[in-house]
Amino acid sequence: MIPVVALVGRPNVGKSTLFNRLTRTRDALVADFPGLTRDRKYGRAEVEGREFICIDTGGIDGTEEGVETRMAEQSLLAIEEADVVLFMVDARAGLMPADIAIAKHLRSREKPTFLVANKTDGIDVDQAMADFWSLGLGDIYPIAASHGRGVTSLLEQALLPWVDEVNPQEEVDEDAEYWAKFEAEQNGEAEEEPEDDFNPQDLPIKLAIVGRPNVGKSTLTNRILGEDRVVVYDMPGTTRDSIYIPMQRDEREYVLIDTAGVRKRGKITDVVEKFSVIKTLQAIEDANVVLLVIDAREGISDQDLSLLGFILNSGRSLVIVVNKWDGLSQEVKEQVKETLDYRLGFIDFARVHFISALHGSGVGNLFESVREAYDSATRRVSTAMLTRIMNMAAEDHQPPLVRGRRVKLKYAHAGGYNPPIVVIHGNQVKDLPDSYKRYLMNYFRKSLDVMGTPIRIQFKEGENPFANKRNTLTPNQMRKRKRLIKHIKKSK
């Protein structure tokens, strides 16, 4: 299961700045997921191949009443649901009473905690950190989050070793061996399909059903299963946890993951329900294909788009399900379709199904799109095929000039699966404009007939073998150089 990292501390110690660096966003609000309390934001971070969910909390104001009574509720919950805590302090301001109170609370929870001293740029670090040793939280990691200084050391020395410990590579997925064989494909003949003893079709498809509360996720699960396996009640929040249910359909095995709804922020009052939001995100990370359920009567909300953003960032295959389609007039249906085209036009690769989970209409067609998305995400493509498609794309639309030179695309190969990753090697490819990168992505998608899954393009440039090297002069060149030096000295 993907680990959860919480950032806690007093106001204005730099939590959001570090959050933005870890999640690679410019504004913490971009990753503001509904279903959490007002000042709590979270996003997906990936560092050197390790993935984790990062939570940014509102500042904790420890006063004379004590941190237990004055600590913001969302920050307390972030500590509870996190696997590890990054406790941030302000090195410029020094040790404050609130820092002491927060440290006391963290020690009582016995959570793995790393003490991070921020704003260390331009000051004597050793002197600034001296007082913080009294907090009794072990080593102190000095950083300057606004400039990125020390963040790499924090990751390499503290966070990444911990992620490896709680989420070892061999436990990531049962099909890791299969994908490892895919990675080794490039060493063989380009067109030859290696003989594999293992096939992705032998694995059950993990199918997560996500959406806002009361959009009909559990009703859809029960309709698919043909039994009342999940509690259903016409009231938001009746599903408290992610439920894993194995099933078989059309001689294919599946694991259905019914999740709790992601609710509008500020409207969650039950502690148990707040915990379920993290489990929803973890279910998305664990799934192969995600069914995003939208209520046709309520339309697309910001919560739907936020959840959609997390699904896309995770690289999961996607099928959009518009539920409660029955009973709507033709005029309303046309309006809903226009809204979908307008707000979801950027994900034209995903199939959209209009269904009624309650009555079962349209549900049977979902699995055709699920299988199509899974097959697209796990399909194996040879280096020769990808290179041929790349060359056709370059012939149809030449790469632009960069600093007076034409960008050269050399070859392409598969860099990963689920989602499909195409790695393109060439000269100056990292300088390609975003418009041409999108063109290549769409060209590969159309040529490979990829449907239901995002496709990613990565660019790599070969190292210059003559970089940082000086030419060795021949004996004649050395003699000529000496004569020139003597001539210059005489002329002076």
Curated annotation (Swiss-Prot):
GTP 2 binds at residues 211-218, 258-262, 323-326. The gene is der. This is GTPase Der. InterPro entries: G_ENGA, GTP-bd, GTPase_Der, KH_dom-like, KH_dom-like_a/b, P-loop_NTPase, Small_GTP-bd. Belongs to the TRAFAC class TrmE-Era-EngA-EngB-Septin-like GTPase superfamily. EngA (Der) GTPase family. Residues 3-166, 205-378 form the EngA-type G domain. Keywords: GTP-binding, Nucleotide-binding, Repeat, Ribosome biogenesis. GO terms for molecular function: GTP binding; ribosome binding. Pfam families: KH_dom-like, MMR_HSR1. PROSITE patterns: G_ENGA (PS51712). Residues 379-463 form the KH-like domain. Gene3D superfamilies: 3.30.300.20, P-loop containing nucleotide triphosphate hydrolases. It comes from the Bacteria. GTPase that plays an essential role in the late steps of ribosome biogenesis. GO terms for biological process: ribosome biogenesis. Associates with the 50S ribosomal subunit. GTP 1 binds at residues 9-16, 56-60, 118-121.
